[in-house]
């Protein structure tokens, strides 16, 4: 691990600490905690691991998608809850599923521009705590029944342009690239198997900050330190699930889509100059990044546009990339992008992904960067790329160089 002047230039963006909570299942182990609390836990742990005093932080940029009823300025709540001073600037980012990664990109840009030297970035989501809305109540509910709007569906999982769920877009992708139900189920089973193997080998231990959850009413509190989704795997059952979005000939199911979940992830970024000055251990550098967008209903394959942009921005060739994390919004997303980019399956999501681990919307973009860092460390890789699609037709991608 290097923090020598030869390997780090003054304006390099250096990752010096990372942490994430376990991914809690929908209405599961972490559902008693708001996203902001999960965010605080991840930030505090990342700073502690980085050996960076919270008082040195100049800015916090944090992703969050389902902000209704979280209270004002969620990123600020997460930061102050982690002991970061009142004088620190905080901004919440909403780029749907790419929020956590976009937050890291914005933080990196501020370091490259010389505006900041120490920034905390990441993302958080508690899908379990997303409220349902009485959308018409403010105008006066004069007569008859009122209907509830599901905030999670409306603001997180619905294509407003075509008035359909994200899963319907996944079906469109499966149709376009001729990806069968069996292929998607095989991929989903592989995601669980890889995730379980990684968990058993302790590959996630260095990523995770254990979360203490109050038992309430005098009952003892429990410690949550494992990704909850991995404990619910049943391959035979997964293959028998009914399609969720298309009755006739549908291929996308609850089993081969990402699971609704709760979690937070944080990264501490510093300039090369600051890393040398403070004698910090540099885990990796951010080499490049890129965003892309296309038709909203084809958000599924936007990573295939963003990933080459990020690799080019890093001044690399795709042949130099050792490992990829492509967020598994749906099994079909990982399969289609692998196909479009010509990537060998053994280089992608080697520790499982959102299908098995969970996909807390605002968190996932940051979570996959932390997982990617662990994979590069464990498998002696040098360059890794994280890519994540987002609702509305977009995607973000980022290149890491392990030191």
Curated annotation (Swiss-Prot):
It catalyses: 2 acetyl-CoA = acetoacetyl-CoA + CoA. It comes from the Eukaryota. Its EC number is 2.3.1.9. CoA binds at residues 237, 258. The active site is at residues 97, 359, 389. It is an enzyme of class 2 (transferase). Keywords: Acyltransferase, Cytoplasm, Isoprene biosynthesis, Metal-binding, Peroxisome, Potassium, Transferase. Disruption phenotype: Embryo defective and lethality when homozygous. Belongs to the thiolase-like superfamily. Thiolase family. This is Acetyl-CoA acetyltransferase 2. It comes from Arabidopsis thaliana. The gene is ACCT2.
């Amino acid at each position: 691990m290097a923090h020598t002047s030869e390997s780090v230039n003054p304006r390099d963006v250096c990752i010096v600490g990372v942490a994430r909570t376990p991914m809690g299942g929908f209405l599961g182990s972490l559902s008693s905690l708001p996203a902001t609390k999960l965010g605080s836990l991840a930030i505090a742990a990342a700073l502690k691991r980085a050996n960076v005093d919270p008082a040195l932080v100049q800015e916090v940029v944090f992703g969050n998608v389902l902000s209704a009823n979280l209270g004002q300025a969620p990123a600020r709540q997460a930061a102050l809850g982690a002991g970061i001073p009142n004088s620190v600037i905080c901004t919440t980012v909403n780029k749907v599923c790419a929020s956590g990664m976009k937050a890291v990109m914005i933080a990196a840009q501020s370091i490259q521009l010389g505006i900041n030297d120490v920034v905390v970035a990441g993302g958080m989501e508690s899908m379990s705590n997303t409220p349902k809305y009485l959308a018409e109540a403010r105008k006066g509910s004069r007569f008859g029944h009122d209907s509830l709007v599901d905030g999670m569906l409306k603001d997180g999982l619905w294509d407003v342009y075509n008035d359909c769920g994200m899963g319907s877009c996944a079906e469109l992708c499966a149709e376009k690239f001729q990806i069968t139900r069996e292929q998607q189920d095989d991929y989903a089973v592989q995601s669980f198997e890889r995730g379980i193997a990684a968990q058993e080998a302790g590959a996630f231990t260095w990523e995770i900050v254990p979360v203490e959850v109050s038992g309430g009413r005098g009952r003892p509190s429990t410690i949550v330190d494992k990704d909850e989704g991995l404990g619910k795997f049943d391959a035979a059952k997964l293959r028998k699930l009914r399609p969720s979005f298309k009755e006739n000939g549908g291929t996308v199911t609850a089993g081969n889509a990402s699971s609704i979940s709760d979690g937070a992830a944080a990264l501490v970024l510093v300039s090369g100059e600051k890393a040398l000055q403070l004698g910090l251990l540099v885990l990796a550098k951010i080499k490049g990044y890129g965003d892309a967008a296309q038709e909203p209903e084809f958000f599924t394959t936007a990573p295939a546009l963003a990933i080459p942009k990020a690799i080019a921005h890093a001044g690399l060739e795709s042949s130099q990339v050792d490992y990829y994390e492509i967020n598994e919004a749906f099994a079909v997303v990982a399969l289609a992008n692998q196909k479009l980019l010509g990537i060998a399956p053994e280089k992608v999501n080697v520790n499982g992904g959102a299908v098995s681990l969970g996909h807390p919307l605002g968190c996932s973009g940051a979570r996959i960067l932390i997982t990617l860092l662990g994979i590069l460390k464990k498998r002696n890789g040098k360059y890794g790329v994280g890519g994540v699609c987002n609702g509305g037709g977009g995607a973000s991608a980022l290149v890491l160089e392990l030191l």
